[in-house]
């Protein structure tokens, strides 16, 4: 049945009855667990020299025992010519003959494998795991569904509707497959309000108790009773996963619906799995981020023009981006929302989404009053999702034919994060710390504003480098005319006379302690003056003035007296105001910040003289008010140079700051975001012969008016500041963008390295800047974090392993968060989730950054996981190795990935850093950026972002040097027309040994051809390739896949999105396509791991479940007693997954250095390293002292084998 179904739906070819190698493989016909022979698995016999294996390039491979168990006896003999070619290549790049240290061999008896090879093994495992769900999906997609009910029942719980619309209450929909949709009244919290489901046999509706029963208020804490029951009714405390029925739930963005299902919060998990039509759409016809912006722009302009080409021409004319010549992809793709996806796959009238606004903005009363209409809306969405699913399923199985893809996505869809009462404590502590720091910052800013206001005395503000251009106009004190002129005049002089001007000697004299008579006289005089003052109240205007005598900018910061939220002082001041950077006296490399309406935030560089002559000889009051104190700015910069140890106003070579702390998902997200900005313009370069960097914006000043001692983004001389040039602050997306706030998170690294700092005088400015940095994480993320849906489990819902554990506390709370992971949220099929998959690691200067550590295992359980070491780098390297000479490590890139050592400077990042003269951390970003398809212009932008002191030309030179050494030089093979032109025109051409010609020769040929035959366009190139670099072969392989007729991942054969296929995009979007090859292969890697782990957990009765995968790391929730066996399972999984990659690429071997995880983490919480105490401003004492969580264990393969005796069998497991 399984093979027939897969052949029918997926077109998978499964060989029947392969002959297994003796003692190594189990026949593919055996899908049930292999019976034990009653003996524990023993380790491989050890021999001192018989196990060590080296390939011809002196790279240590798997031990003989492991190699024979996985790949069989013997092996491919490498071609001698290929070996010599590899040696010469490595010698050219200074890597041949480098000393290496062999690793101890791993002696391990693996579980017996299915099928005749690794591919069949994984195929059969995945078929077994996904078959029940595939059968359910097939039956659902082929079913004739019953008609929709005409009227929906107003009743708590589930209602089933028969074929004739008859309604009956049911406990749960006992169906194998459902299309499901949940709606939530957001005004009432996250509790589900109503739901609709459909199966092949019936419609179902569900209403919450909060909808049916009217109460004044409901508790905000959610329990399982508030959620939707959808699984088999069983006692949660005694059930295991095997007690649940296998069910499939289909939905659009189904992770949202899953978060409202009761059984999904149980620790043991269930056998319900989820298929997301949004994820399937991304895999079939998803859009890259750049395509999505084009698609949205075209959609918004549809009423203006209907022809895509015209839209494209318009975009080319108006946009700063690349010229898009092919628009066919727009007809076979869409955005991700259900309405657009339904329109793409099904067509017909557009879905009406207006009723959804009632759930977003309305109250529960509104929903009750519109119950039938809203149920109808929800049912329409369910029906639309079913229609989309019918069209998608065969397309998905055709384009992702390997069963591992489906099985991996099903497993990815059941992420689970356990939490306890520490979660609420974390939220409280982080918010209170944030508010306390915010109050301190507010106080510092208000004091800065009060101090700045004092500069009005003596017009000292005119010499201030920051405050000179603020509104210093004063509002005069107004009063009514007095009836009795003489008395009023004499009386009105008294308070003024007594007040005296600021700094008057009368106020500063100290005559000593007064006598009793003097005190009495003073009291009488004070009483008299008070009475006189009271008598003048009638002179006040009817509407009181707002702070007369204070400058205009200060008055705007103070609330009016009639404001209900009035507080004294400049309490309206915040970081979002433009005056704040000026009050804090912010400087950029010693230059004062300045705001321009046309260019945003920048800074003033003194020394300009060409605009000083334009100053009026006798300036008016207005012009004097805006005269820049350029001499004060010069003095400010001189002091900065002295403080920094600079003797002259000249640029000094400085080390790059380590501002990019790139860890876990931040690495690839940062690079991918920047890489998307890069546009491949190779065709233009080839035809035009222009390879110069981009011309600076026209707004920049001519060379005759720019500073010699400073260069940056500018100068922009349309900002005419006498005596100064205006330079823009660098924007992360390029110089054409304006900076809206210097307090944005992109400038935090510049605050840390001292480039952006508060000015001289006092500690208030620097402290406010420091606090801004500390609260930045919580300010940006607290809404997402605080709105996480936490469901607390009653004791009856906890398994015995928890309640009987010694550390179980009756007073504590235990619950879970279900991260709403979109299993394929990008065109690379990467998972997407806004909070957990983007969470950074704990930092001592970031409030709330200990977020991940709040995921804590319940008593009796631990979190077991590991990071895949250099996942994308190894995938790209092994692709290049297989392409070049068919040996591991035969390219310089592959050798550095496998054998490179940071201590010797031979690893990839150290080599790149040494080549360009940058830090190793920055080199990581460039290396990943190239692999993701980013070109040289990306490197130029990134170099200037890392080091803003670089000129554009310096950045271009460094980038060119980096790409010449790594990616190599572009070479071309001439077509028949090209060869004919060379002969006919007698064009001298230098060729390599392989017949390649350079870009310069190609331009020469084209120039001569266009001169002799003006109107004919010659196709002179038949093939392009990179040569001479450490990564040339790898890029040639990536580009050959990306430019093939139907790009597929090399291991699992998944197709690229239809919107990026060469037939519809021609030569466009190459960055996205090359990026897809590596990242989509990394998703294949993850899916293989998930399938292998599920097999080993079931085969050897390891009590655990999948928790989450964050980019290249996986975490499992495991019973404490099974923790070491789970760690061994992870190591075996990594070994088999890497071997699967090698096998599919024709490399029947694997280097020892990448076979196993460097360490498997066993911990009670989720953190990057088991030794991290996660100290932050909101957790100053650390995890152990505050939350009672000790350090975990990090075990390598040798330690794990020692603890488990190399066996996954339970009886061999040592006690804790």
Swiss-Prot record:
It catalyses: DNA(n) + a 2'-deoxyribonucleoside 5'-triphosphate = DNA(n+1) + diphosphate; a 3'-end 2'-deoxyribonucleotidyl-deoxyribonucleotide-DNA + H2O = a 3'-end 2'-deoxyribonucleotide-DNA + a 2'-deoxyribonucleoside 5'-phosphate + H(+); a 5'-end 2'-deoxyribose-2'-deoxyribonucleotide-DNA = (2E,4S)-4-hydroxypenten-2-al-5-phosphate + a 5'-end 5'-phospho-2'-deoxyribonucleoside-DNA + H(+). Residues 301-314 have a biased composition (Basic residues). A 2'-deoxyribonucleoside 5'-triphosphate binds at residues 867-868, 870, 872, 920, 924, 928, 1112. One of its GO terms (cellular component) is mitochondrial chromosome. A motif (Exo I) lies at residues 179-183. The active site is at residue 181. It is found in: Mitochondrion; Mitochondrion matrix, Mitochondrion nucleoid. Changing residue 273 to H: In Novikoff hepatoma cells. This is DNA polymerase subunit gamma-1.
């Amino acid at each position: 049945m399984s093979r027939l179904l897969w052949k029918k739906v997926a077109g998978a070819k499964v060989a029947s009855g392969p002959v297994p190698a003796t003692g190594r493989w189990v026949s593919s016909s055996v899908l049930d667990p292999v019976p034990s022979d009653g003996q524990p698995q023993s380790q491989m016999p050890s021999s001192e020299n018989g196990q060590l294996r080296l390939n011809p390039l002196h790279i240590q491979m798997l031990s003989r025992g492991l190699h024979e168990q996985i790949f069989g006896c013997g092996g491919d003999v490498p071609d001698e010519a290929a070996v010599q070619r590899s040696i010469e290549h490595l010698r050219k790049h200074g890597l041949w003959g480098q000393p290496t240290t062999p690793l101890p061999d791993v002696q391990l008896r693996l579980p017996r494998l299915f099928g005749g090879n690794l591919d069949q093994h994984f195929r059969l495992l995945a078929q077994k795991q996904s078959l029940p769900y595939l059968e359910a999906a097939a039956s659902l997609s082929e079913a004739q569904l019953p008609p929709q009910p005409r009227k929906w029942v107003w009743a708590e719980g589930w209602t089933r509707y028969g074929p004739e619309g008859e309604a009956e209450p049911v406990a749960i929909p006992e169906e194998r497959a459902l299309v499901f949709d949940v709606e939530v009244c957001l005004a009432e919290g996250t509790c589900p309000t109503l739901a609709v489901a459909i199966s092949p046999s019936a419609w179902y509706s569900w209403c919450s108790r909060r909808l049916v029963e009217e109460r004044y208020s409901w508790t905000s804490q959610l329990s399982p009773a508030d959620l939707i029951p959808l699984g088999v009714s069983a006692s949660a405390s005694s059930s295991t996963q095997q007690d649940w029925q296998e069910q499939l739930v289909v939905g659009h963005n189904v992770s949202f619906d899953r978060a409202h299902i009761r059984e999904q919060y149980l620790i043991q998990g269930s056998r319900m799995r989820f298929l997301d039509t949004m994820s399937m759409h991304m895999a079939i016809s998803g859009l890259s981020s750049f395509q999505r912006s084009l698609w949205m722009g075209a959609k918004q302009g549809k009423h203006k023009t209907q022809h895509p080409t015209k839209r494209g021409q318009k975009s080319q004319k108006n946009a700063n981006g690349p010229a898009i010549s092919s628009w066919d992809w727009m007809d076979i793709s869409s955005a991700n929302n259900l309405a657009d996806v339904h329109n793409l796959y099904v067509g017909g009238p557009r879905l009406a989404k207006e009723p959804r606004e009632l759930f977003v903005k309305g109250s529960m009363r509104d929903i009750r009053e519109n119950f039938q209409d809203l149920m109808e809306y929800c049912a329409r969405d369910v029906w639309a999702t079913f229609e989309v699913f019918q069209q998608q399923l065969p397309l998905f199985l055709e384009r992702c034919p390997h069963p591992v893809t489906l099985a991996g996505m099903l497993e990815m869809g059941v992420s689970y994060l356990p939490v306890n009462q520490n979660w609420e404590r974390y939220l409280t502590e982080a918010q209170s710390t944030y508010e306390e720091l915010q109050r301190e910052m507010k106080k510092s800013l208000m004091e800065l504003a009060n101090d700045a206001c004092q500069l009005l005395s003596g017009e000292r503000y005119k010499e201030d480098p920051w405050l000179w251009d603020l509104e210093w106009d004063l509002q005069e004190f107004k009063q009514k005319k007095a009836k009795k002129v003489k008395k009023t005049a004499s009386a009105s002089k008294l308070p003024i006379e007594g007040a005296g001007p600021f700094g008057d000697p009368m106020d500063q004299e100290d005559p000593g302690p007064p006598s009793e008579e003097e005190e009495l006289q003073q009291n009488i005089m004070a009483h008299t003056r008070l009475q006189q003052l009271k008598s003048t109240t009638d002179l006040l205007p009817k509407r009181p003035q707002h702070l007369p005598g204070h400058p205009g900018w200060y008055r705007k910061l103070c609330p009016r007296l009639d404001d209900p939220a009035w507080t004294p002082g400049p309490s309206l001041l915040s970081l979002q105001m433009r005056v704040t950077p000026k009050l804090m006296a912010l400087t950029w490399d010693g230059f004062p910040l300045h705001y321009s309406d046309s260019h945003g935030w920048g800074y003033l560089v003194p020394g300009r003289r060409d605009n000083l002559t334009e100053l009026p000889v006798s300036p008016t009051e207005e012009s004097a008010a805006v005269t820049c104190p350029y001499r004060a700015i010069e003095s400010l910069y001189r002091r900065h140079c002295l403080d920094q140890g600079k003797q002259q106003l000249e640029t000094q070579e400085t080390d790059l700051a380590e501002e990019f702390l790139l860890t876990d998902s931040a690495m690839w997200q940062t690079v991918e975001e920047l890489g998307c900005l890069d546009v491949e313009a190779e065709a233009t370069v080839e035809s035009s012969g222009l390879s110069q960097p981009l011309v600076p914006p026209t707004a920049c000043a001519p060379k005759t008016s720019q500073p010699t001692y400073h260069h940056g983004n500018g100068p922009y001389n349309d900002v005419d500041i006498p005596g100064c040039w205006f330079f823009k602050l660098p924007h992360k997306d390029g110089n054409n963008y304006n900076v809206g706030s210097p307090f944005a998170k992109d400038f935090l690294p510049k605050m840390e390295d001292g480039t952006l700092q508060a000015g001289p005088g006092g500690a208030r400015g620097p402290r406010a800047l420091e606090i801004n940095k500390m609260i930045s994480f919580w300010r940006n993320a607290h809404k997402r974090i605080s709105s996480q849906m936490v469901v607390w489990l009653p004791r009856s819902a906890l398994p015995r392993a928890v309640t009987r554990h010694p550390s179980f506390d009756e007073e504590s709370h235990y619950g879970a968060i279900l991260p709403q992971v979109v299993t394929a949220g990008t065109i690379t099929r990467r998972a997407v989730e806004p909070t957990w998959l983007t969470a950074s690691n704990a930092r001592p200067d970031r409030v709330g950054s200990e977020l991940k550590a709040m995921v804590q295992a319940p008593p009796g359980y631990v979190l077991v996981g590991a990071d895949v070491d250099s996942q994308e780098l190894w995938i790209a390297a092994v692709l290049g190795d297989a392409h070049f000479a068919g040996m591991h490590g035969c390219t310089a890139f592959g050798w550095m990935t496998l054998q490179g050592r940071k201590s010797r400077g031979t690893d990839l990042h150290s080599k790149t850093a040494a080549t360009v003269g940058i830090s190793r951390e920055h080199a990581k970003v460039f290396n990943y950026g190239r692999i993701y398809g980013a070109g040289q212009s990306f490197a130029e932008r990134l170099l200037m972002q890392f080091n803003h002191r670089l000129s554009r030309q310096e950045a271009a030179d460094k980038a060119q040097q980096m790409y010449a050494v790594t990616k190599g030089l572009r070479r071309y093979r001439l077509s028949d027309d090209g060869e004919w032109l060379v002969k006919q025109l007698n064009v001298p051409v230098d060729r390599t040994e392989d017949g390649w010609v350079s870009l310069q020769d190609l331009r020469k040929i084209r120039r001569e051809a266009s001169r002799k035959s003006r109107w004919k366009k010659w196709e002179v190139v038949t093939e392009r390739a990179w040569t001479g670099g450490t990564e040339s072969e790898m890029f040639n392989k990536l580009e050959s896949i990306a430019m093939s007729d139907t790009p597929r991942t090399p291991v699992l054969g998944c197709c690229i999105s239809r919107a990026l296929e060469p037939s519809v995009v021609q030569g466009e979007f190459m960055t996205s396509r090359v990026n897809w090859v590596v990242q989509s292969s990394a998703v294949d890697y993850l899916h293989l791991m998930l399938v292998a782990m599920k097999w080993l957990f079931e085969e050897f009765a390891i009590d655990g479940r999948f928790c989450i995968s964050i980019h290249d790391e996986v975490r499992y929730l495991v019973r404490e007693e099974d923790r070491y066996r789970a760690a061994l399972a992870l190591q075996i999984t990594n070994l088999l997954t890497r071997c699967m990659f090698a096998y599919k690429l024709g490399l029947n071997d694997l280097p020892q250095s990448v076979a196993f995880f460097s360490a498997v983490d066993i911990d009670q919480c989720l953190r990057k390293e088991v030794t991290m105490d996660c100290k932050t401003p909101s957790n100053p004492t650390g995890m152990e002292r505050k939350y009672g969580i000790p350090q975990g264990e990090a075990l390598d393969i040798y330690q794990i084998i020692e603890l488990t005796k190399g066996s996954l069998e339970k009886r061999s497991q040592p006690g804790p």
